[in-house]
Amino acid sequence: MKKTFNFLLAAGLFCISTVVWADNSQPTAGTELRPSQKAMQARAGWMKEMNTNLPTMKYEEVAKSATALASQTEAAGKTHPNPLGKDLTLKVSSLATATAEAAGKKDGGTAKMKLTEIKATCDECHAKIRDKK
């Protein structure tokens, strides 16, 4: 009887802890990403795609990612409330446009140089705005 009770108690605790753990792993309103975080993740994804596709000479894919980055940053930059953030975001947009043009011409050297400039601009923005907080 005592062994049965202990087994049922252990099984019950296991089931309850599993349910509680599973419930905690679901995203809540407090853990959802803010719109700016979603935008930054998209930008990071496009940068990763370009850095992956450029060495393999997939220029069409590089141009596609650069165009997406350019249009998203242009739209965000026009309404950015911080003047420095606005300037840096629009700079990323113009560099991404130049990257797309270079990729369209299959000019890997220029595209790589522009990607390096985009990364430097991102780092500058993070240092002066995001990480400053």
Each PLM stretch: what is its role?
Residues 10-14:
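Short, linear, compositionally biased motifs with a strong N-terminal bias
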Residues 2-3, 43, 130:
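Basic side chains
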Residues 15-18, 22:
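N-terminal signal peptide c-region/cleavage motif recognized by signal peptidases
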Residues 22-119:
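Extracytoplasmic c-type cytochrome modules immediately beyond a signal peptide or single-pass transmembrane anchor
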Residues 133:
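Short Cys/His-rich "knuckle" micro-motifs
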Residues 118-130:
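The canonical Cys-X-X-Cys-His
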Residues 1-9:
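Bacterial N-terminal signal peptides that target proteins for export
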